[in-house]
Amino acid sequence: MIRFEELKKGADGLVPAIVQDQNTLQVLMLGYMDAEALAKTQETGLVTFWSRSQGKIWTKGETSGNYLHLVSLAVDCDKDTLLVRAIPDGPTCHTGSKTCWGDAVPESQGFIRELEAVVKGRHEQMPEK
């Protein structure tokens, strides 16, 4: 459990939270958390932020239905940024794009590419039956 009081906050009292897709490793969005958002995220398993534009707490997906389901949280070495690994229910961006960067951030294949290469190599080395 990450304790908000142990994190270094910006002048606004918030901590940036980078959200990454657990399965593809693609960076989905950047949000900001205050103590309440972090606590709610850890308690409910639904990623929650502080909306700087609306000045209130919001759970990603509460309007669209495209929730981000928390898998893990990590703190960087400076203790001033969070990495949120999540499984998205649908597009993350309010525009309908998978990420808040549109197509500018290519989908990572993570370990799948490596696994695919191993399987292909072993298949090629199999004796014929």
Each language-model region and where it sits:
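Flexible "arm" and connector segments at domain edges
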Residues: 1-129
